[in-house]
Curated annotation (Swiss-Prot):
Function: Catalyzes the oxidative phosphorylation of glyceraldehyde 3-phosphate (G3P) to 1,3-bisphosphoglycerate (BPG) using the cofactor NAD. The first reaction step involves the formation of a hemiacetal intermediate between G3P and a cysteine residue, and this hemiacetal intermediate is then oxidized to a thioester, with concomitant reduction of NAD to NADH. The reduced NADH is then exchanged with the second NAD, and the thioester is attacked by a nucleophilic inorganic phosphate to produce BPG.
Domain of life: Bacteria
BP-aspect Gene Ontology terms: glucose metabolic process; glycolytic process
GO molecular function: glyceraldehyde-3-phosphate dehydrogenase (NAD+) (phosphorylating) activity; NAD binding; NADP binding
Lineage: Bacteria, Pseudomonadati, Pseudomonadota, Gammaproteobacteria, Enterobacterales
Protein name: Glyceraldehyde-3-phosphate dehydrogenase
Subunit relationships: Homotetramer.
Organism: Klebsiella aerogenes
């Protein structure tokens, strides 16, 4: 998914991929995707490397990032997407190998700085290793910031109705740490934990301790929804809240926070470029201080 997204940008050039998979299989997985469809371009393998749209991309299969020799192919930024090297110490091996910066595509396991577009991205000060947090945090944080900046959040609860992930089971299987997580993904709505709401307090310190949440894993292949229920400091009608979110989506958060009043469903957001889209018709207010946002 990182590769497909990067290929659509003129300001990003992919020069290398490190994966333990065979190059032929990597090409196959890039060409065909059950959720996002066929790749819009040409994909070949030559001399053990990928050739995408006529451009050769170096393929390596190193277990230790320190041996990757990123300097030989002029790597500026590494997208660390293995889910393994999630600390500054381990991710720094990419720097040792010649890369200039590393972006972790998931939450770090230490105090690696975390940045989320639409939340605290403007505070980035050139750190060489950063975390982009999780997809849920990227969805929740921009919305929470708009609400807090305009109306103030006293406290809130978040529920994410989350699409199936690759770690789930197709049928019931052993899962010693998470018994419910071992149940068949296609047959169940599975309650689960998530640190996304608490993580918002790390990228928006003014909300630290004010939000928490949980997740439901549901049998859909892609697109998740965040249900944010908050108690407001400043009374506001639902129309006023919508107006503030729409203004942000057309102004400072354009391209990050979207806004829609259409009668949409989850598949309408497959391939969405915004990290968060506010569904104006799905939310509801109990009163001017207690509101559910979707």
């Amino acid at each position: 998914i990182v590769f497909r997204a990067a290929q659509k940008r003129s300001d990003i050039e992919i020069v290398g991929i490190n994966d333990l998979l065979d190059a032929e299989y990597m090409a196959y997985m890039l060409k065909y995707d059950s959720t996002h469809g066929r790749f819009d371009g040409t994909v070949e393998v030559k001399d053990g490397h990928l050739v995408v749209n006529g451009k050769t991309i170096r393929v390596t299969a190193e277990k230790d990032p320190a041996n990757l020799k990123w300097n030989e192919i002029g790597v500026d930024v590494v997208a660390e997407a293995t889910g393994i090297f999630l600390t500054d110490e381990t991710a720094r091996k990419h720097i040792t190998a010649g890369a200039k910066k590393v972006v972790l595509t998931g939450p770090s396991k230490d105090n690696t700085p975390m940045f989320v577009r639409g939340a605290n991205f403007e505070t980035y000060a050139g750190q060489d290793i950063v975390s982009n947090r999780s997809c849920t945090t990227n969805c929740l944080a921009p919305l929470a910031k708009v609400i807090n900046d305009n109306f103030g959040i006293i406290e809130g609860l978040m529920t994410t109705v989350h699409a199936t992930t690759a770690t789930q089971k197709t049928v019931d299987g052993p899962s010693h740490k998470d018994w419910r997580g071992g149940r068949g993904a296609a047959q169940n709505i599975i309650p689960s934990s998530t640190g996304a709401a608490k993580a918002v307090g790390k990228v928006l310190p003014e909300l630290n301790g004010k939000l928490t949440g949980m997740a439901f894993r549901v049998p859909t292949p892609n697109v998740s929804v965040v249900d944010l229920t908050v108690r407001l400091e400043k009374a506001a009608s639902y129309e006023e809240i919508k107006k503030a979110i729409k203004a942000a989506s057309e102004g400072p958060m354009k391209g990050v926070l979207g806004y829609t009043e259409d009668d949409v469903v989850s598949t309408d957001f497959n391939g969405e470029v915004c990290t968060s889209v506010f569904d104006a018709k799905a939310g509801i207010a109990l009163n001017d201080n207690f509101v559910k946002l979707v």
